[in-house]
């Protein structure tokens, strides 16, 4: 945000200048306070500059606005961020996925397209990125870390650490970091190419390296975290997630932890009756 824009939004927040749009009579979803409360939301130059809750902020008055929208009790919530997904698993293009996701409140998605990369290599990633630029939401990508997933696999492409460095430079605003590191033996054995791929991500502004470490514990988990892998979405029990959190990692997904009843009633995905 430039100084000029900052001064403009501050003036609007203080009520010294009119806001562009004022949403009134809304139910505001406060995700930090974990509550829903009635109030209004003011927007200036595409920035939310003011939230006024009914009752608590009555003394502050309201905002003068070029446009007032009566929400009639509808909800206003922050845009949802899907922090990890594989769009190509759905067999639809990024723009089409985004069209449907937007109707459910998702405004940002972080995609790891290692499936198409294992088939079509960097050209597959370019297709996903270029198509995603037409989307009504923001789609960012993680560089697939394991193409192929393991050294002995016969994938449709090979993406080396040098390839990754060049691709990060080619798409600096689209590729955030390194996608889930599935080559666990490569990390545990300090394989030079595996370490070089992690280091390539460390040269990006975000330095984001995602993990994929089901049931990894003890010294192996220490090595995984020491390599700079900061997040994992494969914990299946609370103790496993806590084990990773205690080593400074982020537990990205709690789906397995919050749906135990549903999961216990489902047949195994490997069941012959599935």
Indicate where each model-derived feature is located.
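Conserved small/polar residues in nucleotide/adenosyl-binding loops
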Residues: 255-261, 274
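Short loop/turn motifs at secondary-structure junctions and domain boundaries
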Residues: 30-34, 90, 156
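Active-site core of metal-dependent hydrolases
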Residues: 177-257
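Hydrophobic alpha-helical segments, chiefly the membrane-spanning helices
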Residues: 266-274
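N-terminal metal-binding scaffold of metallo-dependent hydrolase/deaminase domains
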Residues: 1-63
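Active-site neighborhood of phospho(di)ester-bond hydrolases with catalytic His/Asp-centered motifs
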Residues: 81-83, 112, 142, 179, ...
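Divalent-metal coordination cores built from histidine and acidic residues
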Residues: 2-13, 95-206, 249
């Amino acid at each position: 945000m430039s100084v000029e824009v900052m001064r403009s939004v501050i003036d609007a927040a203080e009520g010294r200048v009119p806001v562009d749009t004022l949403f009134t009579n809304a139910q505001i979803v406060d995700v930090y306070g974990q509550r829903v409360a009635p109030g209004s939301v003011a927007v200036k130059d595409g920035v939310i500059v003011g939230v006024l809750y009914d009752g608590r902020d009555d003394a502050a008055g309201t905002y003068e606005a070029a446009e007032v929208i009566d929400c009639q009790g509808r909800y206003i919530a922050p845009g949802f961020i899907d922090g990890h997904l594989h769009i190509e698993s759905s067999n639809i293009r990024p723009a089409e996925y985004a069209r449907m996701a937007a109707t459910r409140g998702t405004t940002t998605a972080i995609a790891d397209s290692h499936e198409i990369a294992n088939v079509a290599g960097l050209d597959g990633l370019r297709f996903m990125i270029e198509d995603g630029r037409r989307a009504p939401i923001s789609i960012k990508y993680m560089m697939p870390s394991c193409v192929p997933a393991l050294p002995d696999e016969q994938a449709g492409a090979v993406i080396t650490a040098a390839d990754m460095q060049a691709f990060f430079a080619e798409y600096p605003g689209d590729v955030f970091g390194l996608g889930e590191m599935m080559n666990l033996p490569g990390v545990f054995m300090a394989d030079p190419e595996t370490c070089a791929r992690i280091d390539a991500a460390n040269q990006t502004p975000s330095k984001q390296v995602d993990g994929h470490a089901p049931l990894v514990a003890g010294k192996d988990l220490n090595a995984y975290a020491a390599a700079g892998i900061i997040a994992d979405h494969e914990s299946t029990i609370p103790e496993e997630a806590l084990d990773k959190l205690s080593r400074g990692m982020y537990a990205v997904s709690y789906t397995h932890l919050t749906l135990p009843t549903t999961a216990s009633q489902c047949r195994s995905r490997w069941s012959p009756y599935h």
